[in-house]
Amino acid sequence: MSLQKCQEEWGELEKEFQQLQETHKVYKQKLEELNGLQNLCSSYINKHKRRLTELKGNLHGYKHTSNVEEKELVQQINSTIKERHNAFFDMEAYLPKKNGLYLNLVLGNVNVTLLSNQAKFAYKDEYEKFKLYLTIILLLGAITCRFVLHYRVTDEVFNFLLVWYYCTLTIRESILISNGSRIKGWWVSHHYVSTFLSGVMLTWPDGLMYQIFRNQFLAFSIYQSCVQFLQYYYQSGCLYRLRALGERNHLDLTVEGFQSWMWRGLTFLLPFLFFGHFWQLYNAITLFGLSRHEECKEWQVFVLALTFLLLFLGNFLTTLKVVHTKFQKNKLKKP
């Protein structure tokens, strides 16, 4: 290329750079405007919430009024207040907010709010794919440890993978909750408990107690991964249909349990889930028995027994509550 052409090329680059600077200047101005609007919205929401709380407290005195019209008015206002809080939840999903304790400990005070629906859905979709791929890897790992590689070091690798998997799930779920996902209750706590359980399994030294429980735990892991794969496959299809009908939020997630929206076509999963829950109870009973063994010296045995019992109670009672609530609603619908 001749020097003259290089000079012409440089001249074009200079013009483009000037345009880029102007565009970037406008971008920074818009960003400042956006930050100002975000702060304004957050301020209005907090102020509105405080006033609604005060109003709800004032209305509480009229809860047992004998006047029918006043009673209906109070119920109507309380119902509207509940809807208003749901609207605030949706608004706050697009506004920067302080992270919860867990995210602060893991990530620090970093803004994790995604501003567009496209970005939120892409992150949710990536989370679901992560769960699917790791479920398959964990299934293969459990099968390999159970039937092929009978070494403590391979068990350690498998248990470390479980710890990393559940830790990562808790972080990603916390980010999704900050962005408007309505996953809550036991199905969030469940992963924290599973992280703890996997960590204790990782620290359990090799010995007689470990070898007695090893095959039972690996068989349980194989079954659990198979059920989780089934849940992902059928829940994702069900959620897609419900979102298309406008009956579910675009950030609703697949879970390792049973929720009310799954009654439409997913009740066949219940026997598999209940069998898995009772297997957790069986694990707890086995470990409680091992903890009383005369050769048991490891603290991990009793702690794991309590953790499996906690998982059983949480999973079983939560699933049972969903089933009971559904039957109660069906009874009310009958003439």
From Swiss-Prot:
The keyword Secreted does not apply. It is a multi-pass membrane protein. The chain crosses the membrane at residues 100-122, 130-150, 157-177, 193-213, 268-288, 300-320. Its main location: nucleus. GO terms for cellular component: nuclear inner membrane. It is found in: Nucleus inner membrane. PANTHER family: TRANSMEMBRANE PROTEIN 120B, TRANSMEMBRANE PROTEIN INDUCED BY TUMOR NECROSIS FACTOR ALPHA. Residues 1-39 form a coiled coil. Necessary for efficient adipogenesis. Does not show ion channel activity. It comes from the Eukaryota. Belongs to the TMEM120 family. Keywords: Coiled coil, Membrane, Nucleus, Transmembrane, Transmembrane helix. This is Transmembrane protein 120B.
